[in-house]
Amino acid sequence: MTEYLLLLIGTVLVNNFVLVKFLGLCPFMGVSKKLETAIGMGLATTFVLTLASVCAYLVESYVLRPLGIEYLRTMSFILVIAVVVQFTEMVVHKTSPTLYRLLGIFLPLITTNCAVLGVALLNINENHNFIQSIIYGFGAAVGFSLVLILFASMRERIHVADVPAPFKGASIAMITAGLMSLAFMGFTGLVKL
């Protein structure tokens, strides 16, 4: 049980996919302008990352390895992620049309989010079992969502602040992301895996 808790904390805080592994930067910068959109994207990504992680484990364990076709791993994981994203898009469209409109193009772009594919591939490379795959996928998703929501709230505050003209827009966003990354470095000694 402790191992699973350490894996979760390590994935969320210590080895955050956005701030440490630099995966998922496109939605991190693109969807973080408004808090409401960031929360929606975080929830959708959490669902997709967790489900894609589980599906990737099952495909690897019950299809690719038994048939000896591990070389098709990346292509099959992309296909699995695309199916999971389409399922998520249908669910969001039916349950919350407002959120569906807010997320716009970013919902289908979860398919190309490198963090989703990265989590699936790292699960296999680190030889996680089924439970660890679920926790790793969920932890990566929670870490992504946490950073996205924190960054969106900071960007909203910066938008109304008196920022010098040369720093407006992407410049101050990158500086803020860097400072946020430094803050998360404080968690480095928290968990050793």
Curated annotation (Swiss-Prot):
Q: What is its main location?
A: membrane
- Asked if the record carries the keyword Membrane, the reply is yes
Q: Which residues cross the membrane?
A: 5-25, 39-59, 67-87, 102-122, 134-154, 171-191
Its keywords, alphabetically, are: Cell inner membrane, Cell membrane, Electron transport, Membrane, Translocase, Transmembrane, Transmembrane helix, Transport
Q: Name one GO cellular component term.
A: plasma membrane
The superkingdom listed in its UniProt entry is Bacteria
Q: What's one Pfam family here? A: Rnf-Nqr
Per its UniProt record, what InterPro entries does this chain match? Ion_transpt_RnfA/RsxA, NqrDE/RnfAE, NqrDE/RnfAE_oxidrdctase
Under Enzyme Commission nomenclature, its number is 7.-.-.-
Question: What are the subcellular locations of this protein?
Answer: Cell inner membrane
Q: What class of enzyme is it?
A: translocase
Please give a single GO biological process term from the UniProt record: electron transport chain
Q: Membrane topology per the record? A: Multi-pass membrane protein
Determine if Transmembrane is one of this entry's keywords: yes
Subunit comment = The complex is composed of six subunits: RnfA, RnfB, RnfC, RnfD, RnfE and RnfG.
As for what it does, the entry says: Part of a membrane-bound complex that couples electron transfer with translocation of ions across the membrane.
Q: Which family does it belong to?
A: Belongs to the NqrDE/RnfAE family.
Please report the name of this protein according to its UniProt entry: Ion-translocating oxidoreductase complex subunit A
Q: Which organism is it from?
A: Vibrio cholerae serotype O1 (strain ATCC 39315 / El Tor Inaba N16961)
